[in-house]
């Protein structure tokens, strides 16, 4: 399905990509989550960019022995290229804080908050960020009918890349009584907002710009659409009135800064049809770096090529005391 494959690395290994350079970077990716493939595709591009920029690079496939591997190679910096559980949820940053190894992307609090859709929603609302109405449903509630009026969105608590997200439309042959809760015993049920899908790239606290996603095949911006060529068109910059565009960037910066994010992030919004009201969907503290990813595309439009983007992210590396 995907044009970009991950034959360059075998599972659970340390692989020296470059043994000479100004600093030694451990590129941590792969791992055990449902987003393993995306992580490896991101890491391939990041690894090449780091080598081109003159760094010594060692790839580490995330596993239970990650601390042993890091102790063995003694990197100057960890480039956290993980997506999903253990990397994006704050686990790896927590370990690196203990080991006193500087790392890219957000720390424990921002990562864990952004990854948990329930807690991030509470954070957004506390900071007056507009979101769609939602409720939490547990498997034990034994709901037999639609929990809210259709159309609505089903979201797992802690998955990225739209894994497990389903949109239930009026005409769908769907019975909630048969929903099997594949990604945990609780889900968020969110009112579906019909509108324009907008994405904002943020780097070091400043919004670089925004683009709009135009769906070409699927009904919503799901995993397949995100990572398969020809399923979506990116309009960069997003064709919006200036006042709405500026508000979109300011809201994104507000989310990033109040959550104390670091490095690169991507904020997602819906601009509701008819009302032009912005609804925040989420902030991703570990945005993809694949050839189809949004942050590199927006950065490139604004004059930051991929190698420079990776170097800018690397400059933010630190650990938390």
UniProtKB/Swiss-Prot annotation:
<dbReference type="GO" id="GO:0005524">
    <property type="term" value="F:ATP binding"/>
</dbReference>
<comment type="function">
    <text>Cell wall formation.</text>
</comment>
<feature type="binding site">
    <location>
        <position position="284"/>
    </location>
    <ligand>
        <name>Mg(2+) 2</name>
    </ligand>
</feature>
<keyword id="KW-0547">Nucleotide-binding</keyword>
<keyword id="KW-0961">Cell wall biogenesis/degradation</keyword>
<dbReference type="GO" id="GO:0008716">
    <property type="term" value="F:D-alanine-D-alanine ligase activity"/>
</dbReference>
<keyword id="KW-0479">Metal-binding</keyword>
<dbReference type="InterPro" id="IPR016185">
    <property type="entry name" value="PreATP-grasp_dom_sf"/>
</dbReference>
<feature type="binding site">
    <location>
        <begin position="148"/>
        <end position="199"/>
    </location>
    <ligand>
        <name>ATP</name>
    </ligand>
</feature>
<keyword id="KW-0067">ATP-binding</keyword>
<dbReference type="InterPro" id="IPR013815">
    <property type="entry name" value="ATP_grasp_subdomain_1"/>
</dbReference>
<feature type="domain" description="ATP-grasp">
    <location>
        <begin position="121"/>
        <end position="315"/>
    </location>
</feature>
<keyword id="KW-0133">Cell shape</keyword>
<dbReference type="InterPro" id="IPR011095">
    <property type="entry name" value="Dala_Dala_lig_C"/>
</dbReference>
<comment type="pathway">
    <text>Cell wall biogenesis; peptidoglycan biosynthesis.</text>
</comment>
<comment type="similarity">
    <text>Belongs to the D-alanine--D-alanine ligase family.</text>
</comment>
<keyword id="KW-0573">Peptidoglycan synthesis</keyword>
<dbReference type="GO" id="GO:0005737">
    <property type="term" value="C:cytoplasm"/>
</dbReference>
<dbReference type="Pfam" id="PF01820">
    <property type="entry name" value="Dala_Dala_lig_N"/>
</dbReference>
<keyword id="KW-0460">Magnesium</keyword>
<dbReference type="InterPro" id="IPR011127">
    <property type="entry name" value="Dala_Dala_lig_N"/>
</dbReference>
<feature type="binding site">
    <location>
        <position position="282"/>
    </location>
    <ligand>
        <name>Mg(2+) 2</name>
    </ligand>
</feature>
<keyword id="KW-0963">Cytoplasm</keyword>
<feature type="binding site">
    <location>
        <position position="268"/>
    </location>
    <ligand>
        <name>Mg(2+) 1</name>
    </ligand>
</feature>
<protein>
    <recommendedName>
        <fullName>D-alanine--D-alanine ligase</fullName>
        <ecNumber>6.3.2.4</ecNumber>
    </recommendedName>
</protein>
<dbReference type="GO" id="GO:0009252">
    <property type="term" value="P:peptidoglycan biosynthetic process"/>
</dbReference>
<dbReference type="GO" id="GO:0008360">
    <property type="term" value="P:regulation of cell shape"/>
</dbReference>
<feature type="binding site">
    <location>
        <position position="282"/>
    </location>
    <ligand>
        <name>Mg(2+) 1</name>
    </ligand>
</feature>
<dbReference type="GO" id="GO:0046872">
    <property type="term" value="F:metal ion binding"/>
</dbReference>
<keyword id="KW-0464">Manganese</keyword>
<keyword id="KW-0436">Ligase</keyword>
<dbReference type="InterPro" id="IPR005905">
    <property type="entry name" value="D_ala_D_ala"/>
</dbReference>
<dbReference type="InterPro" id="IPR011761">
    <property type="entry name" value="ATP-grasp"/>
</dbReference>
<dbReference type="InterPro" id="IPR000291">
    <property type="entry name" value="D-Ala_lig_Van_CS"/>
</dbReference>
<dbReference type="GO" id="GO:0071555">
    <property type="term" value="P:cell wall organization"/>
</dbReference>
<dbReference type="Pfam" id="PF07478">
    <property type="entry name" value="Dala_Dala_lig_C"/>
</dbReference>
């Amino acid at each position: 399905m995907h044009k970009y494959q991950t034959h360059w690395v075998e599972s659970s290994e340390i692989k020296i990509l470059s043994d000479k350079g100004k600093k030694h970077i451990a590129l941590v990716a792969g791992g055990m989550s449902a987003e393993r493939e995306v992580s490896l595709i991101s890491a391939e591009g990041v690894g090449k960019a780091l080598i081109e920029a003159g760094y010594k690079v060692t790839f580490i496939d995330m596993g239970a022995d990650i601390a042993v591997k890091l102790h063995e190679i003694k990197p100057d910096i960890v480039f956290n290229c993980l997506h999903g559980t253990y990397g994006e949820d704050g686990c790896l940053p927590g370990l690196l804080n203990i080991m006193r190894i500087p790392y890219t992307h957000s720390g424990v609090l921002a990562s864990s908050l952004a990854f948990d859709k329930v807690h991030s929603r509470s954070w957004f609302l506390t900071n007056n960020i507009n979101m769609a109405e939602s409720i939490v449903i547990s498997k034990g509630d034994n709901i037999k009918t639609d929990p809210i009026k259709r159309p609505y969105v089903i979201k797992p608590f802690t998955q990225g890349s739209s894994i497990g997200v389903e949109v239930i439309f009026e005409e769908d042959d769907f019975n909630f009584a048969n929903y099997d809760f594949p990604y945990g015993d609780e889900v968020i049920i969110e009112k579906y907002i019909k509108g324009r899908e907008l994405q904002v790239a943020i780097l070091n606290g400043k919004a670089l710009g925004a683009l709009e996603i135009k769906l070409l095949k699927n009904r919503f911006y799901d995993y397949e659409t995100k990572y398969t060529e020809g399923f979506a068109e990116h309009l960069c910059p997003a064709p919006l009135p200036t006042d709405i565009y500026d508000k979109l960037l300011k809201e994104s910066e507000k989310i990033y800064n109040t959550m104390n994010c670091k490095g690169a992030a991507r904020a997602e919004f819906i601009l509701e049809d008819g009302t032009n009201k912005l609804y925040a969907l989420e902030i991703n503290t570990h945005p993809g770096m694949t050839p189809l990813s949004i942050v590199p595309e927006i950065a490139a439009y604004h004059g930051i090529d991929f190698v420079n983007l990776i170097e800018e992210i690397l400059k933010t590396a630190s650990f938390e005391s």
